[in-house]
């Protein structure tokens, strides 16, 4: 593309670029909405085959509804301690699992109910924090450092 030499050239260039820029903007919006749909529909338990032709407004409304259903503590600005953060994450995961697991046909209903009950029993109230954080991964051992002046090759002498 060449640089405009006159004001008319600049106006013509803008006129030609405007539809291109609008097309790119719409493509970005549509791609983001498609990704949002793929993320939110499974969390809401909606069938993807039935919802393949959702309108953009429907996707945005479902996303807003999903975010409103989330506990407000997830979005608070104060950073919780590691134990509280772990417990909140555990509870959020359990709540999501309780919504999704019954609709899933992978497990028998009795097994699903037993699993959920077991996980609920592992949930600890805020009053008795007996649940500890999972152990941090052990650091990888560092390779031995050869003494200065020696080569990296092994020699029998």
From Swiss-Prot:
User: Motif (WRPW motif) spans which residues?
Assistant: 154-157
Cite the GO molecular-function annotations of the record: DNA-binding transcription repressor activity, RNA polymerase II-specific; protein dimerization activity; RNA polymerase II cis-regulatory region sequence-specific DNA binding
Report the PROSITE patterns cross-referenced here: BHLH (PS50888), ORANGE (PS51054)
- Where are the stretches annotated Disordered? 124-157
| Superkingdom, natural source | Eukaryota
UniProt keyword terms in alphabetical order = DNA-binding, Nucleus, Repressor, Transcription, Transcription regulation
Q: Which residue intervals define the domain bHLH in the entry?
A: 13-70
Orange domain location: 86-119
Compartment list: Nucleus
The cross-references to InterPro entries, in alphabetical order and at most eight, read:
bHLH_dom, HES_HEY, HLH_DNA-bd_sf, Orange_dom
GO cellular component: a single term: nucleus
Any Pfam family: HLH
Compositional bias ranges of the Pro residues kind: 132-149
What this chain does, per the entry, is described as: Transcriptional repressor of genes that require a bHLH protein for their transcription.
Note on domains (UniProt):
Has a particular type of basic domain (presence of a helix-interrupting proline) that binds to the N-box (CACNAG), rather than the canonical E-box (CANNTG). The C-terminal WRPW motif is a transcriptional repression domain necessary for the interaction with Groucho/TLE family members, transcriptional corepressors recruited to specific target DNA by Hairy-related proteins.
Q: How does it assemble?
A: Transcription repression requires formation of a complex with a corepressor protein of the Groucho/TLE family.
Name of the protein in question: Transcription factor HES-2
């Amino acid at each position: 593309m060449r640089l405009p030499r006159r004001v008319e050239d600049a106006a013509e260039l803008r006129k030609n670029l405007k539809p291109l820029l609008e097309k790119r903007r719409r493509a970005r919006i549509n791609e983001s909405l498609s990704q949002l749909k793929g993320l939110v529909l499974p969390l809401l338990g909606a069938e993807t085959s039935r919802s393949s032709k959702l309108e953009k407004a429907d996707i945005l409304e479902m996303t807003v509804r999903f975010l409103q259903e989330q506990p407000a503590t997830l979005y608070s600005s104060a950073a919780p301690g590691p134990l509280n953060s772990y417990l909140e994450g555990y509870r959020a995961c359990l709540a999501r699992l309780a919504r999704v697991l019954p609709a899933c046909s992978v497990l028998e209903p009795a097994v699903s109910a037993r699993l959920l009950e077991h996980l609920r029993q592992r949930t600890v109230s805020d009053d008795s924090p007996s649940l500890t954080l999972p152990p941090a991964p052990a650091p990888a051992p560092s390779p031995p450092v050869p003494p200065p002046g020696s080569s990296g090759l092994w020699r029998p002498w």
